[in-house]
Amino acid sequence: MHIVRIHQPGGPEALQLEQVAEPTPKSGEVRIKAMAIGVGRPDVLMRQGIYKWMPPLPATPGAELSGVIDQVGEGVGPERIGQRVLISSRDLPQRGGCYVQSIAVPHSKPYVLTDSISFQDAVSLPNLQLALALLQAANLNPNAEKRALLITGAAGGVAGMLSQLAKTHGFQTIGTARTPIKRDFALANGFDVVLDSNPESLYEDVMKATAGLGVNLAYDHLGGAYLPAYIRSLSSLGTAISYNVITGQPSVDVFSVMRELLSKSLGVRCFSMHTFDENESNRRQLMQQAIDSMASGKIRAPLPTVMSLNEVVQAHIILDKGETLGKIVLNPQ
């Protein structure tokens, strides 16, 4: 079978497509024939060798994979064969490992998929799981007025899921994106308003979009000049949640910005999905909630960019350039 490995961290060219023997499930394991593989930011960090949860080299990236159980190990019932499942490396002892055509994992780790969820859509479920956790982190008051929510990277997979969830809670959803193509994509995937992501004009643009009221919640994964602009765009008692700093740390003192706006009583929270690394019950409950939401049609996956496994280098070039629309999905077969 084919597998992607990193022997020496670097750019997209560090991803090597290699041929290895297909795994045989050990006692208590199942083998999954991959039908779709998700591509995301943690894969880039692993490729660069700077991922905090880096496995030993040679390493195989890939945080999620969907497919069919085609073989079981000793102690696992044969009725598992043929099950449509999703595996997330968040549930495995070691991160990554999903850029493969076949994988053997402990039998209790895969999530069973309903027939209504396609394999391509299934690898967006971890994005929905993260979106659910991000809303959970906001500690929403069910009785409070919900006006607007602001999200960076509106054309991305997590942002699209977060927007859909926020609308079910009664929020107007406002996204930001760098290019007209990305803004059109985000609008087509359910955002109410999508603004240019220029941090210099963001505050004024948000105020225009909200009749001068600002937003209750702001979700930022870019950092840099963006986070201070998002904080300024909050309404009184609003909260900004930072869940990554892709463009680096803010160059201005965020606390000084908050003190400047003291009369608004604003809050800032940092969030990481790794909060749930030692809380398997909550993590799996969030994923099951994500599966149920997608299976019912309440939440839908964004249109994916589908590429073959042997195009993995090109997929990472797209990621590095920030040209992703929705979710990049690799077809391994």
Task: Spell out what each predicted region is.
Residues L86, N216-Y219:
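N-terminal Rossmann-like NAD(P) cofactor-binding module of classical short-chain dehydrogenase/reductase
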Residues C98-Y99, A177-F185, V252-V257:
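Short, glycine/polar-rich helix-capping loops at beta-to-alpha or helix-loop-helix junctions
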Residues V123-E200:
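Mid-domain Rossmann-like dinucleotide-binding core that forms the NAD(H)/NADP(H) cofactor-binding site
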Residues A21-G38, I50-D91:
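Glycine-rich beta-strand-centered segment in the early N-terminal region that forms part
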Residues P78, I87-G153:
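NAD(P)H dinucleotide-binding glycine-rich loop of Rossmann-like/cofactor-binding domains
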Residues G212, I291-D292, S296-V306, V313-Q333:
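C-terminal capping/lid region of NAD(P)-dependent oxidoreductase domains
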Residues S201-G212:
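Short amphipathic alpha-helix with an adjacent loop that forms part of the alpha/beta core around
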Residues A225-K298, P332-Q333:
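Glycine-rich phosphate-binding loop and adjacent beta-alpha segment
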